[in-house]
A protein has these predicted regions:
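Short, solvent-exposed loop/linker segments at beta-strand-coil boundaries, enriched for Pro/Gly
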Residues: 239-242
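Repeat-solenoid scaffold signature
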Residues: 13-28, 137-139
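Regulatory extensions appended to serine/threonine kinase catalytic cores
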Residues: 113-119, 123-211, 218
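Conserved activation segment of eukaryotic-like protein kinases, specifically the C-terminal portion
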Residues: 1-15
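Terminal C-lobe "cap" of eukaryotic-type protein kinase domains
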Residues: 95-125
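Conserved C-lobe activation region of Hanks-type protein kinase-like domains
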Residues: 20-26, 32-91
């Protein structure tokens, strides 16, 4: 017995290979998909209403992925909607496994990638303020900038959160200074607890490398919510941390021994001194000169 057919990789069901880390990665993706959406990635309406043979064919990957952006022939009207229960990052990881990874085993999302994406997703949820609901949902504004609970349609107050961004630079040749080329949002973190520990996987991509430079996940800084509802920045590990208050140009280091720094919307938090990038020797062809920062929203 190699496993339950519903969770087995197609190449296992076809008896092409023995179980390995790639088939395990596929099975994990199916289980996570089922936990979130209450369904199988290849069992849409055209299979759900079909024969047992069609269901077996679906487990073999002979039907399109339910959330395939290029075709909607196998969509499900019975599963929980993807945009309600998963972040964009999780959606992309599922697509990698069930579209590209269906035939190319090397493309399948790893357990570590899923673990980090699930960690990030767990920090993006908020609790509905409707006392008759109190369900959790991914904090995401609609076109009217409202935070509507998908379970009861209650309009919730806008939460405080950190928006992490990556900033790219190119050089002004004549002034020997840098100008902003691109700001790309990467992660969000909802500040919902009395103590919000932000881990280093939000600060750097070093955690995903499979080499000697990999870093274990640990708390990088903390944001505490006081009884008066205000938020305060704390640097418990004395990591490199700077803040630029809204409507100011001054960068202030935040050190372990310092008093907590009150945070307001639009304050900027940096994880290295941003002023050092003004002095780098780059030219107009340079790309990838990058640092990450967070905006209090």
């Amino acid at each position: 017995v190699l496993g339950t057919s519903r969770y087995m990789a197609p190449e296992i069901m076809n008896k092409q290979v023995s179980p390995d880390i790639f088939t395990d990665a596929y099975s994990l993706a199916v289980i996570l998909f089922e936990l979130l959406r209450v369904g199988h990635p290849y069992v849409g309406d055209m299979v759900e209403d079909g024969t047992p043979e069609q269901q077996t064919q679906a487990y073999l990957g002979l039907y399109p992925y339910e959330d395939d952006p290029d075709t909607d022939v196998n969509r499900s009207s019975q599963m929980l909607p993807m945009d309600v229960v998963a972040t964009n990052a999780l959606r992309e990881l599922f697509a990698r496994t069930f579209i590209q990874g269906k035939d190319d085993r090397m493309m399948r999302t790893t357990a570590k990638e899923f673990a980090l994406a699930c960690l990030e997703a767990s920090n993006r949820v908020m609790k509905c303020s409707n006392p008759e609901c109190k369900c959790w949902f991914i904090a995401k504004a609609n076109a009217k900038k409202q935070y509507v609970c998908p379970w009861c349609d209650n309009i919730n107050d806008r939460p405080h959160f950190l928006q992490f961004k990556d900033r790219y630079y190119v050089s002004k040749i004549q002034k020997k200074e840098n100008e902003v080329f691109s700001d790309k949002p990467v992660y969000s973190f909802v500040l919902r607890n009395e103590k919000n520990d932000i881990t280093n996987n939000y600060i750097s991509n070093m955690y995903i490398k499979r080499d000697k430079f990999s870093k274990p996940i640990d708390v990088y800084f903390t944001i505490r919510k006081a009884k008066d509802g205000k938020f305060y920045l704390i640097n418990p590990g004395n990591n490199e941390l700077y803040i630029r208050k809204n409507k100011t140009e001054k960068y202030m280091p935040v050190i372990k021994e310092a008093d907590p720094v009150e945070l307001e919307r639009h304050d900027l938090i940096f994880f290295e001194d941003p002023q050092k990038y003004i002095k780098i020797d780059i030219d107009e062809h340079s790309r990838g000169v990058l640092f990450r920062y967070a905006v209090v929203m």
